Amino acid sequence: MNLSIMVQGTASDVGKSVLVAGLCRIFMQDGYRCAPFKSQNMALNSGITPQGEEMGRAQIFQAEAAGIAPDVRMNPVLLKPTSDRKAQVVLMGKVACNMDAVEYHQYKPQLQQQISEVYHSLAREYDVMVLEGAGSPAEINLRDRDIVNMGMAEMADAPVLLVADIDRGGVFASIYGTLALLHPHEKARVKGVIINKFRGDIALLTPGLEQIEALTNVPVLGVMPWLDIDLEDEDGVALQNGKYQDTAEKALDIAVIRLPHIANFTDFNALAAQPDVRLRYVSQLSALGQPDLIILPGSKNTLGDLQWLHHSGLAAALLTLHQRNVPVIGICGGYQMLGKRIIDGVESGLEQMDGLGLLDVETEFAPDKVTTRVSGYCQIGLPGILKNCCDHPLEGYEIHMGVSHLGSAAIPFAQLTLRNGQAEQWVDGAVNGDGSVLGSYIHGLFDSHHFTRALLDSLRQRKGLAAFDGVTVNYAEHKQQQFDILASQMREHIDIDRILKLMKQHQQERAQ
């Protein structure tokens, strides 16, 4: 029988995903075989397993923290919003259907048995399971069909840690209120509280800690300081909170258009980590400025976001800046927008729409989603900003429902050689004649650090700057360093020994 612990929160964005990653890292460092698990994730940031199955990026980076390959069983249900009212339902890595909130709430009981079986199948292979909840367990309107918070804790018979964010204010009320709204048997599962994102003198907080412990009869097991670490976010809340608004002056200014249905903005973390890059997300025309590069990211509603791009004035501004020699890159949905036309009977209900016309490409959406990990290299002889990138290795993954057809004026961007680890030859993406526009389906493209540095040095050259002579960040290594920093901070500020002790005690009680 394995050990387990579940991390729940008083609200969304309190830091559950990061703390789960930290616990996974700690248990891995201490010699345990550990795996993360989240029964249901709602996010547009997703990734692909080595088997070509789609799952939430939060569980992927948690698996990386644990030193294991991502497994779709770690996130059996993924909800990807397609509009304010509907979401695509991905079950065990494959698209099942689209549902609105009412339909999905009615569907949840059918998922419960499958989720339980998947969890226990995974748990049998590991010493420690670290589970993550979603939002808050005190959503009393959803309690009767809960499959992700206390409902999941009961399925796994796992003790619970409750995380609260002090930075947003009202931390003691959020702790007390959450525990007060739980049923007695649910509250009994909560073995400790962690206060997250603290800034200031801990001595000023101590009286409050003593009072909340007395009021709730639940111990506070740690107070985590605000950490300036670079780890991926599972959804767009971080964008809304301005986490990625870099204001420092740096050699290169890169503007990512923040589309209403932006997907996989983690694609650009590797760019933001480079010491000579200022990366910012732009949703208003007045904020676009004069960047050195514009990026159109992926989208879960490509035509809807293309309409928004026109209505916001950003489409016209992008075209004007391109005429003034500002290069443009599109990833996935952004790539499709850069073409001449998009034909769609799948995502938006709109039949077709003209693209921005910067690439000689037409895209037709299809009901079957492509989900695959890919490897290859940048084509030889590409012009413009890609002239220094030729033959550099590329790795990443594709998640899309469209097929793009290149016209005679488009140059293929990449020669791909591996699909989900199997040898295969095909081309990806498109480049215009002067190499000022690139479109690609490869998510995670900028994680390929040799390609990224060559691209950035081309941008520097266009500005009359010398090639960068500092240390280029290898993003894969950078993430591993961030996991170690996180684990070290958690060991310092959280009573990890006590958490492990309560996990073992709970295991013994289960065995009786």
UniProtKB/Swiss-Prot annotation:
Chaperone found in the keyword field: no
GO terms for MF: ABC-type vitamin B12 transporter activity; catalytic activity
CDD domains hit by this protein: CobQ_N, GATase1_CobQ
Function: Catalyzes amidations at positions B, D, E, and G on adenosylcobyrinic A,C-diamide. NH(2) groups are provided by glutamine, and one molecule of ATP is hydrogenolyzed for each amidation.
Keyword annotations: Cobalamin biosynthesis, Glutamine amidotransferase
Species in which this protein is naturally found: Yersinia enterocolitica serotype O:8 / biotype 1B (strain NCTC 13174 / 8081)
Protein name (database record): Cobyric acid synthase
Domain of life where this protein originates: Bacteria
InterPro entries: Class_I_gatase-like, CobQ/CobB/MinD/ParA_Nub-bd_dom, CobQ_GATase1, CobQ_N, CobQ_synth, GATase_3, P-loop_NTPase
Domain GATase cobBQ-type residue range list: 251-451
GO terms for biological process, alphabetical: cobalamin biosynthetic process
Family under the similarity heading: Belongs to the CobB/CobQ family. CobQ subfamily.
Pathway membership: Cofactor biosynthesis; adenosylcobalamin biosynthesis
Gene: cobQ
Active-site positions on this chain: 332 (nucleophile), 443
